[in-house]
Amino acid sequence: MISRTLLKRTVPASRLLRSFTTSNVRLSAHEEDLVNVNNLPRPKPTENYVPLINPTEKYKVQIEELHKFGTYIMSCLPKYIQQFSVWKDELTIYVAPSAIRPVMSYLKNHTSCQFKAVMDITAADYPSRTNRFDVVYNLLSDRHNSRIRVKTYANETSPVPSVTPLFNGANWYERETYDLFGVFFVGHPDLRRIMTDYGFEGHPLRKDFPTTGYTEVRYDEEKKRVIYEPLELTQAWRNFTVGSSVWEPVGEGKDFTPESFKLPTPQPEPEQEEKK
């Protein structure tokens, strides 16, 4: 132990009173022996070396495993799955609307899948197609720490079976997709709007929906309440034909998708003739 007389000679009294541990006292007693880090010699700078990673080999292991898994799923469900694709570390399978429930039930309950959580359900609008909507399901497997995407198709008149009986979390996702795109889900317990107001006209995320909407919401001083009025605009671009928009670029544009990843559009199932 350090004697009190030595501490009184080497350490000021004010510092000694504020020191609650012996380590602080020892450091204060030998401040001259401490090395000043700022005065140490610095190593000479060298050239920065960053290893080059080929983008095609970055996901090489994941792509091979996902291709095996996609092939395995197609071999188990050849009647329902039309095709599958792998992009980087993402696996997507394409099915017909009538196959949604069998495929989702398989992905949820099969031992090799265990995709028990639906993370998102959304859609994309392609007005030039016969089946203009791509309905997308994103699933998560906690057990295998993996994700999968399921895609199907629909239009304004053809509905899609609801997966709410399989996934309780799909309830609001399907309502949101119906509200914003107009995709109808058969078997949904409460299919009504969830994002827009009561009596809203149209579906905002469709490509043919005007950017200004159809009605104007404002507060009326005379009636002392919020009212809805039809818009009176003179813009020529307010009403445009299906498949065109004022925000489209000039020309067809360029498609940067690699040839190996371009997939044909799934064809709809042939209508079955009713037996007389």
Curated annotation (Swiss-Prot):
Residue span of region Disordered: 248-276
Name the Pfam families for this protein: Complex1_30kDa (PF00329)
Q: Which GO terms describe its cellular component?
A: mitochondrial inner membrane
NCBIfam families from the entry? Answer: NuoC_fam, PRK06074.1-5
User: Subunit notes for this chain?
Assistant: Complex I is composed of about 30 different subunits. This is a component of the iron-sulfur protein fraction.
As for what it does, the entry says: Core subunit of the mitochondrial membrane respiratory chain NADH dehydrogenase (Complex I) that is believed to belong to the minimal assembly required for catalysis. Complex I functions in the transfer of electrons from NADH to the respiratory chain. The immediate electron acceptor for the enzyme is believed to be ubiquinone. Essential for N-alkane assimilation.
What family does the entry list? Answer: Belongs to the complex I 30 kDa subunit family.
The protein's name is Probable NADH-ubiquinone oxidoreductase 30.4 kDa subunit, mitochondrial
Per the UniProt record, the source organism is Candida maltosa
Name of the gene encoding the protein in the UniProt record: ALI1
